[in-house]
């Protein structure tokens, strides 16, 4: 009996540790010489939230777009649930996208649509759901992100930036996705509203049992929403570990970045000073 239980426990543990998203040797070059990704290796475990950090131009956004299928990598493998996604057909890509939810850097709302219609957009247009059913789901999600029901009948222009971000989050979770992507989710928000959004992200991801992949410069957001953190530098993942180990990474690049220090191995090109008029 004990032997059987051990096997069951082992199987359960393996299932929980399965990679929901797996990138191996992913490269991408733009033009003839701008090699942005130089062999990205990264795994996101099922049900975990991983945040990619790194400076501007290091490859964060390109990595995210490759996973989403918005950019085609030059080489390497990108698997979702063990299925290779590089080079799949349009129909296979459409089926895969049904697993995804996305909160964009800007809320990316349609100005001419009411809030509930924005939240329900993917349900109606992407899944062919009737408007009544989509409306009910949209209103449920609007309340789930802390907005009053009447907000659902307003236009995006009538909302503050923080409220628009909540609407974007409601849209991201409308179809109960298996994987949610967050692109700089707190950009443009004051510290208090940023923390509100971070708390909502944690709650929504947990309630859905979803896997999350995010990119951000906001270290307060990283510490709040991440289970694991990966740092990308010059197109490669140079550190990957638990968020609790971030301050003790032993990596000078990570240490410099998370503390925002000018001095360190990461160098920034300073602008050439303007010459004084003679």
Show which residues each predicted segment covers.
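Helix-to-loop junction immediately C-terminal to a conserved catalytic motif
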Residues: 68
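Conserved ABC ATPase "signature" region
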Residues: 83-84, 132-150
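Short coil-to-helix segment of the ABC ATPase nucleotide-binding domain corresponding to the Q-loop/switch region
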Residues: 113-121
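Conserved ABC ATPase signature
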Residues: 155-159, 163
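Conserved catalytic motifs of ABC-family nucleotide-binding domains
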Residues: 176
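Catalytic Walker B motif of ABC-type/P-loop ATPase nucleotide-binding domains
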Residues: 180-183
């Amino acid at each position: 009996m004990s032997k059987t239980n051990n096997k069951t426990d082992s199987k359960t543990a393996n299932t929980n540790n399965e990679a929901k998203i797996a990138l191996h040797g992913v490269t991408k070059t733009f033009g003839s010489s701008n090699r942005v990704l130089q062999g990205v290796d990264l795994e996101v475990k099922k049900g975990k939230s991983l945040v990619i950090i790194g400076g501007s131009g290091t490859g964060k956004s390109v990595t995210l777009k490759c996973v989403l299928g918005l950019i085609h990598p030059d080489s390497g493998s990108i698997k979702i649930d063990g299925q290779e996604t590089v080079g799949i057909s349009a129909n296979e890509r459409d089926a895969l996208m049904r697993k995804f939810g996305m909160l964009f850097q800007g809320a990316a709302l349609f100005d001419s649509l009411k809030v509930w219609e924005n939240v329900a957009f993917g349900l109606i247009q992407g899944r062919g759901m009737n408007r009544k059913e989509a409306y009910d789901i949209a209103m449920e999600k609007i309340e789930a992100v802390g907005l009053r029901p009447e907000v659902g009948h307003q236009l995006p222009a009538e909302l503050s930036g923080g409220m628009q971000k909540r609407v974007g989050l409601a849209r991201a979770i409308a179809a109960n996705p298996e994987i949610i992507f967050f692109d700089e989710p707190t950009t443009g928000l004051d510290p208090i509203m940023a923390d509100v959004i971070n708390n909502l992200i944690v709650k929504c991801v947990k309630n859905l049992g979803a896997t999350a992949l995010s990119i951000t410069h906001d270290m307060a957001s990283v510490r709040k929403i991440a289970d694991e953190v990966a740092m990308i530098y010059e197109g490669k993942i140079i550190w990957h570990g638990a968020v609790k180990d971030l301050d003790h990474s032993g990596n000078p690049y990570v240490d410099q970045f998370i503390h925002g220090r000018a001095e360190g191995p990461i160098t920034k090109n300073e602008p050439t000073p303007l010459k004084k008029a003679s």
